Design a protein with these regions (language model features):
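Rossmann-like dinucleotide-binding cores of NAD(P)H-dependent redox enzymes
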Residues: 33, 41-100
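FAD-binding beta-loop-beta segment adjacent to the flavin cofactor pocket
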Residues: 149-160
Length: 172
């Protein structure tokens, strides 16, 4: 998270590995408030752990729905219902504008919809956007990433894509 929007404040954590999870463990106390930025699997898992520890969770996802890049709408619906049933406030189509300092650490967050919420800590679990510029320049079909079939084949002969840049077909 860039420093100009509060990423350097105490109480702001990025979630990439187990060491990151360990670094924020003391924040998970009953009655505290957190903002989770990102509605992918990382953000949703952080929300599940936080609510089990009694933390009040607001989760923002800039996309129109949680898990938009990685799952079918039905999967998003399932996880949304499961998390909201546990008290998670999920706000889709809403991102973070900036974090606000209070007494030397994060104290509130201004969101892209103009609302402001008080928080005790923030978790950044935004993942990455697919790097598909080369495919685009080559005229390869893109659909939420580089479109591939079940074998990883793209629209170009003898060109394959895999990993976060690939968009796999949904076979409901």
């Amino acid at each position: 998270l860039p420093a100009k929007i509060g990423g350097e404040l105490a109480g702001v954590y990025s979630m990439r590995d187990l060491a990151d999870a360990d670094a924020m463990a003391d924040e998970f106390q009953e009655g505290r408030r957190t903002l989770i930025i990102g509605g992918g699997y990382i953000g949703l898992e952080a929300a599940a752990v936080a609510t089990k520890k009694g933390v009040n969770v607001t989760l923002v996802e800039m996309a129109d729905r949680i898990l938009q890049r990685v799952a079918a709408p039905q999967t998003s619906d399932y996880f949304r219902a499961a998390h909201t049933a546990q008290g998670v406030d999920i706000r889709e189509g809403v991102g973070l504008d900036h974090l606000i300092e209070c007494d030397g650490r994060v104290g509130s967050a201004k969101l892209s919809d103009g609302s402001e919420i008080e928080i005790d800590f923030a978790i950044v679990g935004v993942g990455i956007l697919p790097a598909s510029e080369l495919a685009e320049a080559a005229g390869i079909t893109e659909e939420n990433g580089i479109k591939v079939d079940e074998f990883g084949r793209t629209s170009a002969p003898n060109v394959y894509a895999a990993g976060d840049c690939a968009s796999l077909p949904y076979k409901g």
